[in-house]
């Protein structure tokens, strides 16, 4: 009788999972960075993970006179330019900030939230596919200049100060990304 019951329930559960997987609201919403779209990321989860980590890390960021994500970097970014800029910033955060901050996060015991944030940044970045078309060259150059402004400021700081500052500004990055988030 148990085998018969399992055989009846299993197809029903499979169907329910299949249907739930097709409902966009349950998968996460969508980022639309100009021509680049990313689905399956739930922005509130990113915010929650960030605040969990930042509440611990914030005490480390004592340099309030410098801002890495300046208005010149993030304001008035065209939709087309947003794909390139988001890709560059997320790649930098993953390869530089998160990579070098990992050991501190382990000490602070917020690895789960940090991993949620890093893994979602990786998913978003890997799905962003900026066009390599020559017609897009002026747009990609503009995004590159914005990123270099950020990167130069980062490089001018002591590495530990720069890492704390960059991590402390993830909320600025998330707020900017939220402008491209579709429900």
Curated annotation (Swiss-Prot):
Indicate where this protein resides in the cell.
Answer: Secreted
Matches recorded under SUPFAM superfamilies: 4-helical cytokines
How does it get modified after it is made?
A: Glycosylated.
Which cysteine residues pair off into disulfide bonds? 36-83
Glycyl lysine isopeptide (Lys-Gly) (interchain with G-Cter in ubiquitin) cross-link: located at 99
PROSITE patterns from the entry? INTERLEUKIN_10
The coiled-coil segments of this chain are: none
Asked whether the UniProt record includes Glycoprotein among its keywords, one would answer yes
- Alphabetical GO biological process terms: apoptotic process; cellular response to interleukin-4; cellular response to lipopolysaccharide; immune response; negative regulation of cell migration; negative regulation of cell population proliferation; positive regulation of apoptotic process; positive regulation of cell population proliferation
Q: From what superkingdom does this record's organism come?
A: Eukaryota
Residue positions the entry lists as glycosylated: 76
Q: Which GO terms describe its molecular function?
A: cytokine activity
Question: Signal peptide span per the entry?
Answer: 1-28
Annotated keywords: Apoptosis, Cytokine, Disulfide bond, Glycoprotein, Isopeptide bond, Secreted, Signal, Ubl conjugation
Q: Which GO terms describe its cellular component?
A: extracellular space
Protein role: Multifunctional cytokine mainly produced by T-cells that plays a regulatory role in immune response, tissue homeostasis, host defense, and oncogenesis. Possesses antiviral functions and induces the type I interferon response during influenza infection. Signals through two receptor complexes IL20RA/IL20RB or IL20RB/IL22RA1. In turn, stimulates the JAK1-STAT3 and MAPK pathways and promotes the secretion of pro-inflammatory mediators including IL8 and MMP1. Intracellularly, maintains endoplasmic reticulum homeostasis by restricting the eIF2alpha-CHOP pathway-mediated stress signal.
- State the similarity comment: Belongs to the IL-10 family.
What name appears for this protein in its UniProt entry?
Interleukin-24
Q: Identify the gene encoding this protein.
A: Il24
């Amino acid at each position: 009788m148990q085998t018969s019951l399992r055989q009846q329930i299993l197809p029903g559960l499979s169907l329910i999972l299949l249907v739930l997987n097709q409902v966009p609201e349950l998968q996460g919403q969508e980022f639309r960075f100009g021509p680049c779209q990313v689905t399956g990321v739930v922005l509130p989860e990113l915010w929650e993970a960030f605040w969990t980590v930042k509440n611990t890390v914030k005490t480390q960021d004592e340099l309030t006179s410098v801002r890495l994500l300046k208005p010149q970097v993030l304001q008035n970014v065209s939709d087309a330019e947003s794909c390139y800029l988001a890709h560059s910033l997320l790649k930098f955060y993953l390869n530089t900030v998160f990579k070098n901050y990992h050991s501190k996060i382990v000490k602070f015991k917020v690895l789960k939230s940090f991993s949620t944030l890093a893994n979602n940044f990786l998913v978003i970045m890997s799905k962003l596919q900026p066009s390599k078309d020559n017609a897009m060259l002026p747009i990609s150059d503009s995004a590159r200049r914005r990123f270099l402004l950020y990167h130069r400021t980062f490089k001018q700081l002591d590495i530990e100060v720069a890492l704390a500052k960059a991590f402390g500004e993830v909320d600025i990055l998330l707020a900017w990304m939220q402008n491209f988030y579709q429900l």
